[in-house]
Curated annotation (Swiss-Prot):
<comment type="function">
    <text>Catalyzes the oxidation of 3-carboxy-2-hydroxy-4-methylpentanoate (3-isopropylmalate) to 3-carboxy-4-methyl-2-oxopentanoate. The product decarboxylates to 4-methyl-2 oxopentanoate.</text>
</comment>
<comment type="pathway">
    <text>Amino-acid biosynthesis; L-leucine biosynthesis; L-leucine from 3-methyl-2-oxobutanoate: step 3/4.</text>
</comment>
<keyword id="KW-0464">Manganese</keyword>
<keyword id="KW-0460">Magnesium</keyword>
<keyword id="KW-0520">NAD</keyword>
<feature type="binding site">
    <location>
        <position position="109"/>
    </location>
    <ligand>
        <name>substrate</name>
    </ligand>
</feature>
<dbReference type="Pfam" id="PF00180">
    <property type="entry name" value="Iso_dh"/>
</dbReference>
<keyword id="KW-0432">Leucine biosynthesis</keyword>
<dbReference type="GO" id="GO:0005829">
    <property type="term" value="C:cytosol"/>
</dbReference>
<feature type="binding site">
    <location>
        <position position="229"/>
    </location>
    <ligand>
        <name>substrate</name>
    </ligand>
</feature>
<comment type="subunit">
    <text>Homodimer.</text>
</comment>
<dbReference type="GO" id="GO:0000287">
    <property type="term" value="F:magnesium ion binding"/>
</dbReference>
<dbReference type="InterPro" id="IPR024084">
    <property type="entry name" value="IsoPropMal-DH-like_dom"/>
</dbReference>
<feature type="binding site">
    <location>
        <begin position="80"/>
        <end position="92"/>
    </location>
    <ligand>
        <name>NAD(+)</name>
    </ligand>
</feature>
<keyword id="KW-0963">Cytoplasm</keyword>
<dbReference type="InterPro" id="IPR019818">
    <property type="entry name" value="IsoCit/isopropylmalate_DH_CS"/>
</dbReference>
<feature type="binding site">
    <location>
        <position position="254"/>
    </location>
    <ligand>
        <name>Mg(2+)</name>
    </ligand>
</feature>
Length: 380
C-alpha cells in the first residue's frame, strides 16, 4: 500500500527563523522516515522580510496558495529593524494577511516550566514563578488589528489617526468554543476571561457572550472575569492566580501572551499553534478533511543573534511536536519528540554544554537539534 502524503509548508522567515526551523525540519524528516504509511512532504517558501527583499511584498500569491493547499504550516519568525514601523511594506503585514486568508481565529500559547531547574532563569522570584501553568487563547482575526483604520495625514482630519475595535456575537462565541481545543485534566482547567468591560462597549459584549457560551455549552467549566489592567498586574505579581486558560481578544491577547511567555525564563522554549475553524474554500482544489493550522515558536526573529548559530530551537521543535499531535497517526511520534526534547533537557541539567546561551550554556543551535534527533531515532 502506498504512503499517504502530508504536505507541510515551511516558512523560515527572518532573523533566527531559518536556523531554528532547520532543526525542526530535521525532526520532521525523522518522523517521516520512520512512518510506514504516511510521508511528510516539505515545501519551503519566502515569508516576511525576506520575501519583501526578494519579491517586493511580504506574502506573495504563490506562497499564500501553497499555504492554502497545505495540511499544516511551520513558521519560524519574521521582522527586524531593516523593515521598521515607518516602512510602507512590513513583514508583519504577511502574518495578518495569512491569518485572515486561512481563517486562523485562535492562537494557543502555553507558559509553564518543563523543569524546576529553569526557575533560576525566570525574571520572577522562584517562589512566585514556581507552579505557573497558563495557556493563553487569543482571538486572532478580529478587534483593533482588523477594524477600520485611518493613518495620520490621510483624507479628512489629516492631524488624526484611528483604529476601530469591533467584535460580533458569533466571533466571541467561536473563540470561546475553542476552549475545547485544549486538553483538560479532571477537574478541567478554569477559564479566565480578560476584557475592559468597565470602559469598552466591545468588552461588555465580550463578557456577556463568553459568559452565556460557557454556561450554556460548557457548564462544567469554572469561569471568572478580569479587567486587562488587573490581569497584567497579576501575571507579574501572582501569576498562579491565572493558572488555567486565559481567554481574551486580539490586542489584549497580544500583550498578555508576550508578558506571560517570559515567565519561564526563555522565549526559545515554548511552542504555539494558530487554529482555523474549518476549510474556507468551496472549490475542490482547496478542500481538506481538517482545518489548516500554523505552528510556530513564541519568540521573535532576534536579529541581534541571527547568523551566530546560538538560538534555542526547542520552541520550534516542540511546535513540530504540536503539529504531529493533531494527527491521530502521529500521536505516538509527537510524544516521542516531546520525550526527546525532555531527554536533551535532562542532559542539559547535568552538562552545561547542552544549553544554549539564553539558558546560560554554550551549545549551538545545531547541537541541540542533533541531540534531539539522536534520541528520537533511537525511540521511533
Amino acid at each position: 500500500m502506498s504512503k499517504r502524503t502530508f504536505k507541510i509548508v515551511i516558512l523560515p522567515g527572518d532573523g533566527i527563523g531559518p536556523e531554528v526551523v532547520a532543526e525542526a525540519t530535521r525532526v520532521l524528516e525523522v518522523v517521516s522516515a520512520s512512518s510506514s504509511d504516511v510521508e511528510i512532504k516539505l515545501e519551503t517558501h519566502d515569508f516576511g522580510g525576506c520575501s519583501i527583499d526578494k519579491h517586493g511584498e511580504p506574502l506573495t500569491a504563490a506562497t499564500l496558495e501553497a499555504c492554502k493547499l497545505a495540511d499544516a504550516i511551520l513558521l519560524g519568525a519574521i521582522g527586524g529593524p531593516k523593515w521598521g514601523v515607518n516602512s510602507k511594506v512590513r513583514p508583519e503585514q504577511a502574518l495578518l494577511a495569512l491569518r485572515k486568508a486561512l481563517g486562523l481565529y485562535a492562537n494557543i500559547r502555553p507558559a509553564n516550566f518543563a523543569s524546576d531547574s529553569l526557575l533560576a532563569y525566570s525574571p520572577l522570584k522562584p517562589s512566585v514563578a514556581r507552579g505557573v501553568d497558563i495557556i493563553v487563547i487569543r482571538e486572532l482575526i478580529g478587534g483593533a488589528y482588523f477594524g477600520e483604520r485611518k493613518e495620520l495625514g490621510a483624507r479628512a482630519q489629516e492631524d488624526a489617526a484611528w483604529d476601530t475595535m469591533i467584535y460580533s456575537v458569533p466571533e466571541v462565541q467561536r473563540i470561546t468554543r475553542s476552549r475545547r481545543q485544549v486538553a483538560s485534566p479532571d477537574p478541567p482547567l478554569p477559564v479566565h476571561s480578560i476584557d475592559k468591560a468597565n470602559v469598552l462597549a466591545s468588552s461588555r459584549l465580550w463578557r456577556k457572550v463568553a459568559t452565556e457560551t460557557i454556561q450554556n455549552e460548557f457548564p462544567q467549566l469554572k469561569l471568572d472575569h478580569h479587567l486587562v489592567d488587573s490581569a497584567s498586574m497579576l501575571i507579574v505579581a501572582n501569576p498562579k492566580k491565572l493558572n488555567g486558560v486565559i481567554l481574551t481578544e486580539n490586542l489584549f491577547g497580544d500583550i498578555l501572551s508576550d508578558e506571560s511567555s517570559v515567565i519561564p525564563g526563555s522565549l526559545g522554549l515554548l511552542p504555539s499553534a494558530s487554529l482555523a475553524a474549518r476549510p474556507l474554500w468551496p472549490n475542490t482544489a482547496h478542500r481538506r478533511s481538517s482545518p489548516r493550522r500554523v505552528y510556530e515558536p513564541i519568540h521573535g526573529s532576534a536579529p541581534d543573534i541571527a547568523g551566530q548559530g546560538i538560538a534555542n530551537p526547542i520552541g520550534t521543535i516542540l511546535s513540530a511536536a504540536m503539529l504531529c499531535g493533531t494527527r491521530s497517526v502521529w500521536r505516538s511520534p509527537a510524544k516521542a519528540i516531546e520525550a526527546a526534547v525532555e531527554g536533551a533537557r535532562r542532559q542539559g541539567d547535568r552538562r552545561e554544554g547542552l544549553r544554549t546561551a539564553d539558558l546560560g550554556g554554550s551549545s549551538k543551535t545545531k547541537d541541540i537539534g542533533h541531540k534531539v534527533v539522536e534520541i528520537l531515532k533511537a525511540t521511533l
